[in-house]
């Protein structure tokens, strides 16, 4: 069944703001949410920068549900409700079986795990009763489903830094295959906890100050927390109810490097971008804006630049590219969901968000990465790259309708 899939609502929160309007506003104005991590439960870990959500918005999550939720699930539910409000949609007995959710989670509930096991290890006592269900990778999808009453296809997706794009791709498949008419899809993660930060510190991957994608002298990744969700519908379902269509999910490209657990390879990202263009029926020249994976590490940014050149040829120098991780940091499982918001808003507003914190050109990353200043241009097609550790790659193309 060849069904077009469109986006009719979006929700999100991260260090930049607690709704899509504020996320887009500050990202487009190159404001960076990166700063010292103020979490009081870092157990002596010093000098860590990240992009924290300083205060959650009012969410009205039922107390009985809240006690079984990790922060990842809370963020996902808040974003899902915002997306539903924007879409003007509700779930009821008439549509619940045709309404599902896929939520990408890159790391899982380490916040709940650490809070439960630290006292247990020191005292030998029992852990908190909901620890297991808070920490499971599918928890966010389950909690979104229960909060909204969704009874169609519901599952979690985990592929590290590409989890949200894989979740959106999976949701597209559910609609195209006829298993659902509407899907909530995106990602959520909350990695600013001691055990995760220590693990990334051990990999020597963390930047000491900020995230500078594609800039000479960049020093690594900065982690952030957040969630992004979108309401996906079949085109027929959306038009039948008179919904406002924000963009079409025009293509999906998935691949694996089969190379190394941490080191990047060019062929995997190249294959995913080519597959995405083919799936969307697009030529390379049709892409106006590419939201890069752009983590701010020397190897990854150089690798992605090479892959982009291979796929787009001369057009690689004509299209606009940026990494919004420079503003909201790397939110792991939520990263490409937040970048989906950037792509759709670029199409809606005709503005390419900048790569913030850019200092000086790197000759190995010589494409137009929209340094520091947003750019007005017509964006008919935007592409979003997500390339994860372990070599799991997921690329999406969004198109103006």
Curated annotation (Swiss-Prot):
Annotated InterPro entries: Beta-ketoacyl_synthase (IPR000794), Ketoacyl_synth_AS (IPR018201), Ketoacyl_synth_C (IPR014031), Ketoacyl_synth_N (IPR014030), PKS_Beta-ketoAc_synthase_dom (IPR020841), Thiolase-like (IPR016039), Thiolase_acyl_enz_int_AS (IPR020615)
Ketosynthase family 3 (KS3) domain span: 2-400
Enzyme nomenclature, EC number: 2.3.1.-
GO cellular component, one term: plasma membrane
Domain of life: Bacteria
Keyword Membrane annotated: yes
Its job: Proposed to synthesize NOD factor fatty acyl chain. Involved in the synthesis of a highly unsaturated fatty acid moiety, which forms part of a lipo-oligosaccharide that is responsible for host specificity.
Sequence similarity: Belongs to the thiolase-like superfamily. Beta-ketoacyl-ACP synthases family.
Protein name per its UniProtKB record: Nodulation protein E
Organism: Rhizobium meliloti (Ensifer meliloti)
Gene from which this protein is expressed: nodE
């Amino acid at each position: 069944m060849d069904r077009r899939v469109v986006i009719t609502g979006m929700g999100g929160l991260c260090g930049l703001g607690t709704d899509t309007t504020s996320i887009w506003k500050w990202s487009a104005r190159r404001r960076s949410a990166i700063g010292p991590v103020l979490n009081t439960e870092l157990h002596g870990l010093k000098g860590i920068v990240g992009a924290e959500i300083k205060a959650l918005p009012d969410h009205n999550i039922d107390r009985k549900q809240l006690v079984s939720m990790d922060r990842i699930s809370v963020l996902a539910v808040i974003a899902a409700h915002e997306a539903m409000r924007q879409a003007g949609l509700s779930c009821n007995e008439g549509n619940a079986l045709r309404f599902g959710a896929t939520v990408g989670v890159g790391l899982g509930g380490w916040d709940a795990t650490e809070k439960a096991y630290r006292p247990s290890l020191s005292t030998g006592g029992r852990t908190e009763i909901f620890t297991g269900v808070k920490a499971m990778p599918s928890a966010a999808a389950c909690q979104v489903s229960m909060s909204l009453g969704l009874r169609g296809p519901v599952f979690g997706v985990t592929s590290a830094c590409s989890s949200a794009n894989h979740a959106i791709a999976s949701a597209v498949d559910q609609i195209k295959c006829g298993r659902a008419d509407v899907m909530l899809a995106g990602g959520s993660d909350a990695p600013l906890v001691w055990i995760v930060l220590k693990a990334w510190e051990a990999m020597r991957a963390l930047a000491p100050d900020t995230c500078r994608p594609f800039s000479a002298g960049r020093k690594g990744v900065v982690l952030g927390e957040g969630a992004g969700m979108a309401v996906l519908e079949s085109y027929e379902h959306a038009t039948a109810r008179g919904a406002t269509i924000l963009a079409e999910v025009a293509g999906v490209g998935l691949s694996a490097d089969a190379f190394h657990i941490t080191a990047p390879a060019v062929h995997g990202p190249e294959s995913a971008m080519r597959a995405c263009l083919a799936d969307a029926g697009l030529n390379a020249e049709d892409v106006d804006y590419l939201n890069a994976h752009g983590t701010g590490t020397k190897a990854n940014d150089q690798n992605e630049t090479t892959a982009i050149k291979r796929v787009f040829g001369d057009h690689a120098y004509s299209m606009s590219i940026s990494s919004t991780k420079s503003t909201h940091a790397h939110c792991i499982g939520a990263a490409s969901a937040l970048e989906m918001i950037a792509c759709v808003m670029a199409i809606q507003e005709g503005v390419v968000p900048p790569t913030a914190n850019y200092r000086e050109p790197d000759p190995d990353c010589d494409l137009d990465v929209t340094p520091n200043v947003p750019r007005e241009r017509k964006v008919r097609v935007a592409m979003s790259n997500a390339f994860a550790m372990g070599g799991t790659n997921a690329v999406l193309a969004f198109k103006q309708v």
